[in-house]
Amino acid sequence: MELEYESKRPLYIPYAGPILLEFPLLNKGSAFTEEERNHFNLQGLLPDAVETIEEQAERAYRQYQDFKNDSDKHIYLRNIQDTNETLFYRLLDSHLSEMMPIIYTPTVGEACEHFSDIYRRARGLFISYPNRDRIDDMLQNATKQNVKVIVVTDGERILGLGDQGIGGMGIPIGKLSLYTACGGISPAYTLPVVLDVGTNNPQRLNDPLYMGWRHPRISGDEYHAFVEEFIQAVKRRWPNVLLQFEDFAQNNATPLLNRYRDEICCFNDDIQGTAAVTLGSLIAASRAAGSQLRDQTVTFLGAGSAGCGIAEQIIAQMKSEGLSEDEARARVFMVDRFGLLTDKLPNLLDFQSKLVQKSENLTAWQTQSDAISLLDVVRNAKPTILIGVSGQPGLFTEELIREMHKHCPRPIVMPLSNPTSRVEARPEDIINWTEGAALVATGSPFAPVHYKEQQIPIAQCNNSYIFPGIGLGVLASGATRVTDAMLMAASRALAECSPLATDGHGALLPDIDDIQGVSKCIAMEVGKAAQLQGMAVVTSEEALSKAIEHNFWRPQYRSYKRTSF
């Protein structure tokens, strides 16, 4: 096989001695052979034994198990990543379902809050506003030259934790770890970036150890000019890169996506990735119930950019199943802190305005006040699907869920807020309140629920089912943009991988340990959609499949040969 040949072919490198051991992408530690130790001036710098990567991974896993709390485990794994990336990904490869909650949600949230306290070693780029005239130089300073995927944040809306300043860097680092572990994208091609535009978090500003720019956040024209400078510099340095916007605040997320999605190959995972994985889950859940999404009525708690992004994808799918635009929009109800979005509410954001319900259609509703509450919507609209993206814990109350179950024998309830401390309701409660009838998917990981004689698996509606496959599909196909059709293709591919939808039993979403296969399936459909839309060169399916395999990196050591600079 071509990949086997690639892994056996030697890599020619100019580094030697302690410098080589300090290079995470190239360091093998105790796995350097005797020949390599001689050629690269490593004799005496390592213990005598020459180990395999399997032996190294076994030792690392034993050390990992010695840590009792998740935060310490996260720090330990990050240390391995900053020391020997190949070993880090071999360890993840062997224990992905166990370690994913440690390297990403929910543990990464705590790591972001304490970023300056637990900081060990530089990774990625920190681009601060005071240095805005030197962005080109900063990109040249990146240790990776052939960058193909960037995840960038400004740290303002980190999970459900709000403004963390440069602490938000934990999210791009974690996200790119999953691009590699789940989607096979070589870590040599990835770059995490934080745009340090200050912070409005008084805890960070008053923390003597805070490592970011100690200044209130810039906003308005200054902010957008800074982002523009960054984007143009990226285009000059890596014109074909895939750029993922991550954890930008609501007032910036959608405008930035709309501004740049037709200029560069980019997407916003909070808006589009969340929408894609949720839509894929809902298509699968509808199939499992013997229906289509067009037959469902959907209520959202949370009408921010993420919730509205999901709603628009649901509407697009309903239209593809035969509903008109008006019919589809009439089936989607958006509730925020001021109640149901209607055409009488003032000061709606642009992306919210298309998702309002017409007041004339609500005249027969029985409500408690002029502001139509979530409970009012459940009583009157009688939804079959309830989705939480509010970031506020406990808002899916027992009264609410029982009311929903009165008119819906098999309610689909998705409390998607992250981290776990922000979830709208716990799966165990939802299942108990519906006498075991509810189909539950969450944003953070939860253990299976024991109900009577059943063990009910809880699907984690995690973006990691989607974005690694999108990234792999973009790289393999050479796509120049990420379009709505490509995202829709990703959702449908995920639905095809659902055990519950295909077999009639099991979990709603595939096991996390099967996610590499899922990513390849998604990559194929994303690549085909890119070709159909003229965003990639048209090839045969066989050629696209080979390109996906060729781009799928595996954590194996290659032999090294020495060369000069």
Swiss-Prot record:
The record's remark on the cofactor is: Divalent metal cations. Prefers magnesium or manganese.
The answer, when asked if Metal-binding is one of the entry's keywords, is yes
Q: Which top EC class is given?
A: oxidoreductase
Matching Pfam families: malic, Malic_M
- What does it catalyze? (S)-malate + NAD(+) = pyruvate + CO2 + NADH; oxaloacetate + H(+) = pyruvate + CO2
Protein residues bound to NAD(+):
157, 270, 418
Active site: which residues? 104, 175
Q: Which residues bind a divalent metal cation?
A: 246-247, 270
Q: Site described as Important for activity, positions?
A: 270
Spell out the disulfide connections.
none
What GO MF terms are annotated? malate dehydrogenase (decarboxylating) (NAD+) activity; metal ion binding; NAD binding; oxaloacetate decarboxylase activity
Q: Which UniProt keywords apply?
A: Metal-binding, NAD, Oxidoreductase
> What family is this protein classified in?
Belongs to the malic enzymes family.
Subunit-level organization: Homotetramer.
Name of the protein: NAD-dependent malic enzyme
Its gene is: maeA
